[in-house]
Amino acid sequence: MNDILLQWFGFVSMPRFFQQKNVLSIVFFILFASSSFSKEVRTISVIPVPMEYELQKGYFSIDSLTLFSDALSPKVKCVVDEKLAELGEEGYILDVTSGGISLKACSRAGLFYGKMTLRQLYADNKVPYVRIKDKPRFSHRGIMVDVSRHFFSKEEIKEMINWMSVYKLNRFHWHLTDDGGWRFEVEDYPELTKKTAFRSHHLWREWWKNGGKFVSVDEQGAAGGYYTKEDIKEIVEYAADRHITIIPEIEFPGHSREVFVAYPELCCAEKPYSGGTFCVGNDKTYAFMKSVLNTVMDLFPSEMVHIGGDETNTAAWKNCPKCRGLMTKENMKDIHELHNYIIGEAEKILKSRGRRMIGWDEIANEKRDKSSVIMSWRGEQAGIDAAKKGYDVILTPLHYLYLDYFQASPDKEPLAHDGYTPIEKVYTYRPIPDTLNDEAHAHILGIQGNIWTEWIPNMKHLEYMAFPRTLAVAEVAWSPEEKRSWKSFRNRLGSHIVKLQDAGVNTYKLSSDIESVVNVDTVRKKLEVLLKCEREDVEIRYTDNGLRPTRKSALYSRPLVVKDSLCVKAAAFKKGNIQGDIFTQHFYYHKGIGKKVQFSTRNKSGKILADGYIGGKTYLDGSWVNIHGDQEFIMDLGEEQEVRTVSTRWMQLRAGARRHLPQQVEILFSNDGENYFSGGIVRKKSLKDIPALQYQEYVFNGHWNARYIKMKVKAGDGGMSVDEIIVI
């Protein structure tokens, strides 16, 4: 196996793949012996799907050593042609005919990506006749990995970079510092790695629960690590060989608790473990910032440097004499202007050396220099607004592109952050809204998938969370929107998962479980229930009479219509056998749909409690109402009606932000909205004490006549999430 073959396939200097036990897997993977590539098909199983391609009948036969040799061959021609500038630096044209293989691009980057496509097309010593004209949709196609919460070795970072290059991702955002540990050397501040690169517990949650203390490297049980300058230079070069730019991130002014363990004088309290925010009024802060950022710029040649800027706790600034003094000196009216000030200082340092600053969307401010880049994470609106103002923007909205969120039902998956981003949701993300004009559109540089690692303690787990969702990110970032199709992507994905697994990657396997999507039609007073499964090689069968589905049950082929109530049980079947769990859900077009719901303890509408949509597997999906403390909410049915059942569903989650059940819920009824009578109290059940997602339904049965329904909620141990109020 010659070096150029390995280089083209992204496996240079990969110790993991050179272990003897993996040799067969390497050969199998590189030669693409998967049977799915041996079939006569009229499409190509390439990810990301090319901009244009025309598949012809027939194959060009060629052995791997000839195809991937660095020696000249009349059968394979790779040409850099400046006349192809219309395709940009990363575009290419690939022609496979009976006469041989021709690959053209206007740069070496374009040739590289063409070779990655050729790699995916090659199987069984042949390549299909095809003409491909391809270029990326976005210039920024990124993945972020947090190495502070859990440390990943140099070789593990290289492995991630390899797989990014295979799927034409070109930006590796390296989150190097945070509360969990400082991960690189700074000569002027040696205590950063001496005192805060190692900690008392490996697992983030155990470490945090036990006080979050850092230890020296020689202390028994010390966990963590850092990258030497030579490590970083090696990784930067390694990435550059694969046409990947590394964007380093150093957190300012928040998320910096670890810094003050090493240098407590840089925080307002001047004590270790006293907070996570730099003292903006302290001159030493800016000396530190300048030294660190200059070190970063010496190590990383990237045009852009990320300075964080997110989730800054400003409480310490309010009572800090130095911060107050700076506010007076600079005529600041608001404490938040201090945030703008310190971000501006970072911006100046970077600009002085010809670099551009990136920050999370909290830095978006009219005073910001237009050379700075906004990374929009709390949704899309901040990014859209910034693009309209002329800022360049990278979109990474958490509800679509956070790959540390659950990717399947939380009760069956490893612990994760509390969001829910299954691969279909990642894939169906539309980065450019229709409302964005062409001028603003040009400021959207691209997208990025983020992998925060509070719940990801090792490389096997990182692989599981990253793959195959990273492939979805890659196709959204590269392929034209009109060429993208979830059905097509899902059909292509299976063979790629097999190849990743053959190469030793611990991928997530597409779920066999059934999920539902509900459309509410308030005009026709009905629900339409769509059933779906991630796997494409199964059929869905269901019952609507409460019985367990079998291979003889109705085959799902169109949305189910609900005009009153319907109990659906469904399952995925393959060759007559059930795959995964049986899906069970009651659907109601109930009396409360479309009715007014008002919180009596705060001036807020509870519209989504009566919209007919059932909450999903995350309290962040827009169908749950998230509340704190005792609450009351009142539904107005519009007129007196007979009511026999009122129910609500509540969430318990012992991971991430945590959701708690209310201690009790009381139901009350009224006809005039003033005089209420109680219909009963339901108290919290003792659910399993496990981190996984669980639910409790608070159900009230009886026979009442009323116009108004009030629910009095007695708070649990923290934040609560309530689903639809169902009235029957």
List where the protein language model places each region.
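Flexible, acidic glycine-rich loops studded with aromatic residues
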Residues: 357-362, 367-372, 378-527
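Bacterial Sec-dependent N-terminal signal peptides
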Residues: 1-43
